């Protein structure tokens, strides 16, 4: 009887191993890579998610917010495997021990543009043309600067720089966490929104009227870093590598962002 019991136990053990392997090999149970990211990267992650998951076996789980929110989450100890914030913010996160020194990678750069309903034409080639467009608009939408978004903070400065703060105040609409483009469209064809150009992409009922004039432009460089206590640092490394691949770079460029080159990764 003993040999039979041993054989039975061995078969049971082998079956259990097969079950465990199958469990963790299925897409529903793939290791997850949690990302805290600036919202400007949302359209990029939306388009690369399937390919990243297919080629690496990791499941991408992004969470979006303003740069200020991402920094607050990181400082507060929110668990994540990768943080994507601005180049201005990352050194402080490293200094405070929240991001591993040497893990930072510049991903892309974006600028600020004006969004309007599809079919609306605006000339924004000069500061004066932007001034006229702002004065003519029935509503102007941008991110609430108090929430820490780079675009919202800069737009408020631009309006002040143009000397239009009081004149425009009645028609300013601060979007508290909402999609700037969607809020703009909801206010009708005479409204315009000002936000990161990457956040205007993939909106069929909207169009980019143009970037801010160069004299008033602001560029944000997005940098990724691995948290000091990242649960899935290998997955974070895989995502960083994928973000520098030709496929990811093609998506980044399609969103109106400037990449920082390929590392020759997977095609």
Regions found by a protein language model. Give the residues of each.
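Bacterial N-terminal signal peptides
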Residues: 10-24
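Exported/periplasmic ABC-transporter solute-binding proteins
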Residues: 30-76, 87-88, 92-96, 100, ...
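Intrinsically disordered, low-complexity peptide-like regions
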Residues: 2-3, 69, 79
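Short N-terminal or domain-adjacent regulatory/targeting segments
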Residues: 2-3, 18-20, 121-124
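N-terminal secretory signal peptides that target proteins for export/translocation
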Residues: 1-11
């Amino acid at each position: 009887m003993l040999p039979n019991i041993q054989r039975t136990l061995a078969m049971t053990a082998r079956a259990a191993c097969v079950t465990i392997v199958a469990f963790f090999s299925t897409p529903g149970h793939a290791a997850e890579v949690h990302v805290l990211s600036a919202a400007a990267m949302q359209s990029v992650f939306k388009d690369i998610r399937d390919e990243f998951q297919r080629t690496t076996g990791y499941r991408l789980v992004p969470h979006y917010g303003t740069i200020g929110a991402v920094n607050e989450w990181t400082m507060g100890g929110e668990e994540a495997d990768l943080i994507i914030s601005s180049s201005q913010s990352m050194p402080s996160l490293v200094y405070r021990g929240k991001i591993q020194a040497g893990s930072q990678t510049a991903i892309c750069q974006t600028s600020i543009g004006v969004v309007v309903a599809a079919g609306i034409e605006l000339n924004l080639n000069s500061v004066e043309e932007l001034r006229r467009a702002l004065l003519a608009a029935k509503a102007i939408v941008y991110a609430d600067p108090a929430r820490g978004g780079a675009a919202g903070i800069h737009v408020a400065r631009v309006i002040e720089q143009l000397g239009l703060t009081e004149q425009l105040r009645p028609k300013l609409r601060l979007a508290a966490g909402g999609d700037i483009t969607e809020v703009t469209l909801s206010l009708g064809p005479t409204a315009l929104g000002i936000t990161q150009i990457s956040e205007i992409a993939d909106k069929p009922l909207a169009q980019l009227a143009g970037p801010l004039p160069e004299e008033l432009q602001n560029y944000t460089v997005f940098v990724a870093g691995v948290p000091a206590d990242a649960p899935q640092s290998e997955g974070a490394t895989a995502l960083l590598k994928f973000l520098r691949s030709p496929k990811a770079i093609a998506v980044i460029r399609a969103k109106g962002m400037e990449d920082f080159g390929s590392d020759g990764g997977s095609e």
